[in-house]
């Protein structure tokens, strides 16, 4: 984790140090912001490590309600960025409630199953009613996220929910049904015009950036060029031609992996992916060694969340 924090900070700094349009003339602006975010994250992480996960179980309903309130507030008074009303400004910090909702959904689903199988119900296995309950827990935040609309977060949440349902031991036909429903729902959404035009364009550009390299496919095309520039060993930190020129939009956020690809090359990118893999492996190990069902489902769900989000981000950059 320490390696990811250090490497991520350097990549963010490299992506922004030459971008006066982002930094307002202070080359270290995003470096400072990243360090503040890391400090907050480390403090919260230490607090969570020092807390028995059974307390998390007790607080799960409160966390869930708070996340739903946050999602409602962002629809009412949030800031719109890139077509999605997803951010709240709190004390000078920008907060994305949907990120907290992912955690809330995971521990909420874990609590439901644990209470049904280990609590007063004393079931031996997860039943159909339990799966429906998990889907209801996930459904409310999902609807609020779609209203923003934030399709990327919705995909991560859907994959996470699918993972928790699978880990819970739900009947296999539920997994098949959920997968089929997701595919069918996506097709219907496209055909019925539920998705915004720019969302459809982004998907088409992801599948084939060459269709519109100057329009919808521009981001993905520039990302692929940056990664291709890196070769095996990269152009060197702070030396990437695409990065220094600012050709890759949102490079300090959604396309941060392109900085690694261009400046650290195949070798550096492989190291970054390996570090992500170590974190994922540790999360899965914690899930497998948890001494109760709630802990196993919560850790497993967080592993699914982290793993799919990393896969989505790297895959989006690679095109």
Describe the predicted segments one by one.
Residues 2-14, 20-219, 258-317:
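Hydrophobic alpha-helical transmembrane segments of multi-pass inner membrane proteins, especially
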Residues 15-16, 227, 231, 318:
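Short, small-residue-rich loop/turn micro-motifs
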Residues 215-238, 242:
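Extracytosolic (periplasmic/ER-lumenal) interhelical loops and adjacent juxtamembrane/interface segments
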Residues 232-267, 290:
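Long extracytoplasmic/lumenal interhelical loops at the membrane interface
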């Amino acid at each position: 984790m320490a390696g990811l924090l250090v490497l991520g900070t350097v990549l963010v700094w490299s992506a922004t140090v030459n971008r006066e349009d982002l930094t307002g003339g202070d080359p270290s602006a995003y470096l400072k912001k990243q360090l503040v975010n890391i400090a907050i994250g480390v403090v919260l992480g230490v607090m969570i490590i020092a807390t028995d996960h059974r307390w998390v179980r007790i607080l799960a309903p409160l966390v869930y309600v708070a996340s739903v309130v946050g999602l409602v507030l962002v629809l009412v008074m949030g800031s719109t960025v890139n077509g999605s009303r997803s951010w709240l400004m709190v004390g000078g910090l920008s907060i994305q409630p949907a990120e907290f909702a992912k955690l809330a959904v995971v521990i909420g689903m874990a609590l439901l199953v644990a209470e049904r199988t280990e609590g007063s119900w004393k079931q031996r296995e997860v039943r159909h009613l339990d799966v429906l309950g998990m889907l209801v827990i996930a459904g409310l935040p999902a609807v609020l996220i779609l209203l923003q609309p934030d399709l990327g977060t919705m995909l991560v949440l859907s994959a996470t929910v699918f993972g928790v349902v699978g880990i819970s031991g739900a009947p296999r036909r539920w997994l098949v049904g959920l997968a089929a429903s997701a595919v069918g729902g996506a097709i219907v959404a496209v055909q019925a015009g539920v998705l915004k035009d720019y969302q459809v364009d982004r998907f088409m550009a992801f599948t084939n950036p060459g269709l519109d390299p100057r329009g919808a496919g521009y981001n993905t095309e520039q990302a692929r060029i940056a990664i291709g520039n890196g070769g095996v060993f990269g152009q060197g930190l702070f030396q990437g031609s695409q990065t220094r020129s600012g050709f890759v939009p949102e490079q300090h956020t959604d396309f941060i992996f392109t900085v690694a690809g261009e400046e650290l090359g195949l070798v550096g990118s492989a190291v970054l992916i390996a570090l992500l893999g170590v974190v994922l492996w540790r999360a899965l190990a914690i899930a497998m060694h948890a001494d109760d069902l709630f802990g196993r489902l919560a850790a497993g769900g967080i592993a699914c969340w982290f793993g799919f989000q990393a896969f989505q981000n790297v895959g989006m950059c690679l095109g």
